[in-house]
Amino acid sequence: MIDRYKHQQLRIGLVSPQQISAWATKIIPNGEIVGEVTKPYTFHYKTNKPEKDGLFCERIFGPIKSGICACGNYRVIGDEKEDPKFCEQCGVEFVDSRIRRYQMGYIKLTCPVTHVWYLKRLPSYIANLLDKPLKELEGLVYCDFSFARPITKKPTFLRLRGSFEYEIQSWKYSIPLFFTTQGFDIFRNREISTGAGAIREQLADLDLRIIIENSLVEWKQLGEEGPTGNEWEDRKIVRRKDFLVRRMELAKHFIRTNIEPEWMVLCLLPVLPPELRPIIQIEGGKLMSSDINELYRRVIYRNNTLTDLLTTSRSTPGELVMCQEKLVQEAVDTLLDNGIRGQPMRDGHNKVYKSFSDVIEGKEGRFRETLLGKRVDYSGRSVIVVGPSLSLHRCGLPREIAIELFQTFVIRGLIRQHLASNIGVAKSQIREKKPIVWEILQEVMQGHPVLLNRAPTLHRLGIQSFQPILVEGRTICLHPLVCKGFNADFDGDQMAVHVPLSLEAQAEARLLMFSHMNLLSPAIGDPISVPTQDMLIGLYVLTSGTRRGICANRYNPCNRKNYQNERIYETNYKYTKEPFFCNSYDAIGAYRQKKINLDSPLWLRWQLDQRVIASREVPIEVHYESFGNYHEIYAHYLIVRSVKKENFCIYIRTTVGHISFYREIEEAIQGFSQACSYDT
């Protein structure tokens, strides 16, 4: 079991053959060492029991039933008086069957095999470290090419013949075909190397510190050279410099993590615990097996065949040995990553086998589905809709979701207030949805934030905390300003809601994760809570109006609307008398009484500085009254003057939408100013 306080992180990397052997081997009480899987069998077809030394062997991986060996004998687990601790007939230990979830085995490969992730995945780590083309290394791994061994003191047979013009070339044109298996082994050990063994030799001979020094020197030399004038050559230099940087970073990573490069070539192949690749019996007596079992069987079959060729058959041609090594390499490649070399392997029903990579990667892989994205308690999920009346730090939680998330808190409240005698009575009151339940739920939610998360959580603002309030319906209401942080919109997106339980989690949600405290982007510092989409359209409709300027009102009658205070002139067009209001409250009151529309033009008395008015602007019209006062009408404002040309008041031409928008901004500024004054 992993202790969460001692282990804060999990790292996946390469391990040595010695470490694989330490994981998989164990010494049973009679002194026998077990752990190697040598047979490609699973269960016996008659007894329906695991085969010895097979993929489900109970000696290697532990008993199927706790305390029961393969013979059927039973021992009490943990009883020190009972002896022995294992069955002398079958060699199975009397332990808990849960050991089959973590006890590993191993396959001892007759020939080394490269790990396909480090060879075929881009960038190829093996090609980067060896500074050789990937195509040549692939030919070397799959026995299409051979590698000449560097023997300094003795001249090699092939070099004397002139068979090797290059370090790596096709073995068909360099190796004599008359060698038998016995002679071929001696010849190959002296003259050439092919397959993954050649890669392992080259990786083992590397000095990572020298690689870093040489790469740095070459990078500096390329940097000192100026442009050649040839575009193609300049591009080659840039690509070479980028490659040298990647090579140095890779070598530094190997040094920093104490990983040897030759570990990218496998000599021991780990076998997963049986419970992670089960065989299940379904209706009708049929068996369903994990695809990995079949892929392991192919590896064992081909590995055993290669062992027989090298040990029992003394007259096997060298070509056949190389072909069998290639088959072992391909079988391991299919086990680790099916389809990485081209066409994936399929079963009899033309279905692609799921390899180890398919099991762990992707949305339905072991990590994202079981470890990272598993279901948790005190969480829910629903569609989000806009909540126009919500504050920035609030969210609307449906009653159905809220009562489920806070049910334990409501039960505790009912019992504390002596409204329920026990948990059963409290649950029945919740099922009956009594009014007191909603009152207690409101009290609980007032001091308890919730976390909203929208997948995928690509940055810190993908999960934020809110103060929940109860809403009707079955959807989560959200303030539209927080959508940009979540990268959400209201076209059917779903969000998950979580309840922080511990005091530490609640404090973190309040101090660090509240939406009104995350107004800036953590990446670039720009405002993240900005109006988008629906809000921009709403602001446009709110402030656009139907007419622009007094001229359109008087001389463009085609765009008019009918209002309650309209009169018809003899010219057969309708003229709308625009109402006057002393303050914004009267204008909004008239709108609520449906006397004017949201975009109806009106005159609003305003405290405007005379210096703002352009002195050169000429009024469009001047209306005189009987007492000598007159009105100067401009495009967007109106001035009432006396006979002595003194300003009585100023009216601006606006709409109810503009007034509402201005009042919201004014209230926000006043609230911000008050908050700043409290802080100081």
UniProtKB/Swiss-Prot annotation:
It catalyses: RNA(n) + a ribonucleoside 5'-triphosphate = RNA(n+1) + diphosphate. The keyword Cell division does not apply. GO terms for molecular function: DNA binding; DNA-directed RNA polymerase activity; magnesium ion binding; mRNA binding; zinc ion binding. Its cofactor is Mg(2+); Zn(2+). Keywords: Chloroplast, DNA-directed RNA polymerase, Magnesium, Metal-binding, Nucleotidyltransferase, Plastid, Transcription, Transferase, Zinc. Binds 1 Mg(2+) ion per subunit. InterPro entries: DNA-dir_RpoC_beta_prime (IPR045867), RNA_pol_asu (IPR000722), RNA_pol_N (IPR006592), RNA_pol_Rpb1_1 (IPR007080), RNA_pol_Rpb1_3_sf (IPR042102), RNA_pol_Rpb1_clamp_domain (IPR044893), RNApol_RpoC1 (IPR034678). Pfam families: RNA_pol_Rpb1_1, RNA_pol_Rpb1_2. Its EC number is 2.7.7.6. It comes from the Eukaryota. Its main location: plastid. Mg(2+) binds at D489, D491, D493. Gene3D superfamilies: 1.10.40.90, 2.40.40.20, RNA polymerase II, clamp domain, RNA polymerase Rpb1, domain 3. Belongs to the RNA polymerase beta' chain family. RpoC1 subfamily. DNA-dependent RNA polymerase catalyzes the transcription of DNA into RNA using the four ribonucleoside triphosphates as substrates. This is DNA-directed RNA polymerase subunit beta'. The lineage of its organism: Eukaryota, Viridiplantae, Streptophyta, Embryophyta, Tracheophyta.
